[in-house]
C-alpha cells in the first residue's frame, strides 16, 4: 500500500469519525427541543459541532455540517408526514434548512483567514453574528421562511431567556452560539491561539461562559398587570380522526366545541367567577356561521351559556375563489361583526398555498392539484374585545404557525395588544411534538413582548402562558378539554417590540457584509497564489 493510499484511508476515517460526532451533536441539539425538552443541551451540542468544523478543510467541514444539519432537522420535524401524508416533503424541508447551515459554515470558516479573527473571543463573535444572521434570513425566506428550529427557542427555560425583551430570538441565538464557541475553545485538546496566552486562558474562558450564562438571571421579567386582569376560558373541543372526514360532516366540529363550552359554563371554575371571553381554536367552526344559520345558532348557544363573547375560527371562500382563514368575535345574542375580523397573514407554503402552482400541480399529489390556495389577509393583527366590566381590551392575534413570526405577533403588540392570542388547529399532527414546539414558540413571543399569551387548539396542546414565559395552565393532545385562567394585561413596550425588524435586519446586513469581505479575502488569496505560482514557474 502506497503512502497516498494510507493518507486517503486516514482522511476517510477522519471524515467518518467527525461525521459520527456531528450526528451526535445534531441529535443532542434536537433533544433540547420538545418533545424531549433538555434545553441545557443546546450549548454543548453546538460546541461539539463547532469542534468538528472550525479547523477542518472545506470538504470535511461541508460534509460534517450536512450530517449535523440532517441529524437535527429530520427528527425535529418528524410531524411533516402526518400533515402531508407522504415523506418526501419532510426530507426536502430538512434538506433546505440544512443548506442554510452549510452556507453558514462556508463563510464562517472563511472568516478564520483573517489573523485577528482567530482568537477565542473574535471567533466566537464572528461565528455568533453570522449564525444569527443566517438564522434570521432562513426564518424569513423563501416565501415566509421557516422560523422553527432556532437555537434561541429552548432558552425559554434557561437563564438566557431573560434576554428576550432586549433583542428577541436574534440576540439569544447569537449568545448561544457565542458561548458554544467559547466552550469549544476552553476545552479543546489543542488550541494554539489559547496556548500562546497565559496558563489561565482556558479557565478564564470557562469563567466567562459560566458568568454569561447565569448573568441574565439578574434581569427581571415582569409579570404584574398594567391594565388589570382578563379572565379567559379556553375551549379545546377535539376532532375525530381522520380530521378531513370530520370536517366533511356539517356541524360536527362546531358541536364538539359547543359541547365543551357548555361543560365549561357549568364548571365551578366559571360559575363562581365568570369569564370575560372564551377562546376557541383555529377552524373550530366548520362552516361560515353567517352563511350557515344552524352553525351560527350553535355558536350563539355556547356564547349564551357562557354569557361571554367567543373568539371563533372558520374559513370561507372569497370572491376570487381563494380560501380565507378567519378569526372573529361572536357576541351572545347579536352574533359577529364582519368588520372586526382578522384573516391569516402568513399562509403556510405547500400546506395552505402552492407556490408556482401551474408547475407543481403537474406532478404533485391529487390533494395539491385539487386544493384551493389560501389568500393572505391584510387586516391588522389586533382584535378588541369587551371585558365583563366594560373595558375595551386590544389583543394581538395570530393563527397557528403565525406564533412563529415576530412580524405578525410583534405588529399586534406594537399596535397596542395587551395580551397575545393564537388559535390553532393541530389535528394534522396528532400527538407528535409539533404542538409543544409551537407552544415553545409562543412562550418566546410572550417573553419577547412581556405579554400573557394563549394558544387555543382544537385538539391540543392548549396553553395559558405568563408574560415571563412560564406555563400557567395547559391541556393534553387528542382530547376534549377546557381551561379557565386570569391573565395580566400589560401595556408597556419592550425593546424587542419597539425595534421590530430593525434588530434582525441589522444582523442580516452585518452578516452579508462579513460574507462579502470573506469572499473577497478568498478571491484575493487565490489571485496572489496564482501570481506566485506563475513567478515560480518563470512565466
Residue ranges and their predicted role:
Residues 230-231, 325, 381, 449, ...:
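Structural detector for hydrophobic anchor residues on beta-strands
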Residues 217-351, 372, 382-392, 397, ...:
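Soluble catalytic regions of membrane-associated enzymes that act on cell-envelope
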Residues 2-220, 431, 442-446, 457-462, ...:
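Membrane-embedded alpha-helical bundles of multi-pass enzymes
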Residues 33-48, 72-77, 236-237, 272-287, ...:
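Short, conserved active-site loops that position catalytic residues or coordinate cofactors/metal ions
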Residues 83, 97-101, 128, 285, ...:
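CN hydrolase (nitrilase-like) catalytic-core segments centered on the catalytic cysteine
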Residues 79-88, 115, 139-167, 323-406, ...:
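Active-site catalytic loop in hydrolytic enzyme cores
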Residues 91, 151, 235, 342, ...:
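Hydrophobic residues at beta-strand termini and immediately following loops
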